[in-house]
């Protein structure tokens, strides 16, 4: 779930 990490 790297996409969620983008939020960071």
UniProtKB/Swiss-Prot annotation:
Signal peptide residue numbers: none
Expression (tissue specificity): Detected in the coelomic fluid.
Location (main, coarse): secreted
Keyword set, alphabetical order: Mast cell degranulation, Secreted
Subcellular location: Secreted, Extracellular space
A GO CC term attached to the entry: extracellular region
Top-level taxon in the UniProt lineage: Eukaryota
Primary role: Pro-inflammatory agent which mediates the degranulation of mast cells thus evoking an inflammatory response. In vivo, when injected into rats, diminishes the pain threshold. Induces dose-dependent paw edema in mice.
Additional information: May be produced from vitellogenin or creatine kinase by limited proteolysis.
Protein name per Swiss-Prot or TrEMBL: Echinometrin
Species per Swiss-Prot/TrEMBL record: Echinometra lucunter
Record lineage: Eukaryota, Metazoa, Echinodermata, Eleutherozoa, Echinozoa
């Amino acid at each position: 779930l790297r996409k969620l990490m983008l939020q960071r």
